[in-house]
Amino acid sequence: MPIKSYRPTTPTRRFQTVVSREDITKQTPEKSLVESKKRSGGRNSTGRVTSRFIGGGAKKAYRVVDFKRDKAGIPAVVAAIEYDPNRSSRIALLNYVDGEKRYILQPDGLKVGMKIMSGPNADILIGNALPLKNIPAGTIVHNIELKPGKGGQMARSAGSQAQLVSREGGLALLKLPSGEIRRVAVECMATVGQVGNVDHENVSLGKAGRKRWMGKTPHNRGVSMNPVDHPHGGGEGKTSGGRHPVTPWGQPTRGFKTRNNKRTDKWIVNRKSKKR
């Protein structure tokens, strides 16, 4: 979808861009697939802030998306492409021949009227979901399971894709969007193709208010705080912090590796590539 810009009627309007919604064919969601969504404001059950800079934003209804793709052997027709406020990609409404309706992530190139299917006998076509053992090496996939039957957890955001590099015994080697190469059980399901709405990464919000609509509150720098609030705080006048970047709790940040999960280390062949 093309990026849409606006006439500069205000200073922020000058830089504001949106992804064109010409691909969306249905404005209201399927009622049977909508649930209410409670907002936390970044607080846990005791009322304390556990995720900073979260609050406010437009009210959203949750669309129940099928990440498991476990309806094997039953063909479905794409009935509509819809907007989902809870994720960066579009969602596709499927009408199965047995009458059931489900939402899935819309792969790039999936259009209304196309037929798709899940299961080990499905063809290698965009939108079809198969176990990794039935997908040829080199295929682009998304919505990949980490555990068989749990539902897709990797490569789900707009424009994301992973590549099936090879299979060794009962494990498949995948190159993930981060550059990481990871082993996954060949029984895990994956969907063929790249997630749609590829131009999402090129959008410029243009103004702070648009970030507030998304439920994000202002992010404060540590150097602008007092010493009681942040390790970078204090000093006479403007300072650079005086030390290597750390979090408010003293943990080194900006490139410092904090991963500590020995249980799953054996599944990772190469760590994700560094940002340049």
Curated annotation (Swiss-Prot):
Keywords: Ribonucleoprotein, Ribosomal protein, RNA-binding, rRNA-binding
Bias-annotated ranges (Polar residues): 7-19
A molecular function (GO) term: transferase activity
GO cellular component: large ribosomal subunit
PROSITE patterns assigned: RIBOSOMAL_L2
One of the GO BP terms on file: cytoplasmic translation
A matching Pfam family: Ribosomal_L2
Domain of life: Bacteria
Purpose of the protein: One of the primary rRNA binding proteins. Required for association of the 30S and 50S subunits to form the 70S ribosome, for tRNA binding and peptide bond formation. It has been suggested to have peptidyltransferase activity; this is somewhat controversial. Makes several contacts with the 16S rRNA in the 70S ribosome.
Recorded family membership: Belongs to the universal ribosomal protein uL2 family.
Protein name, entry field: Large ribosomal subunit protein uL2
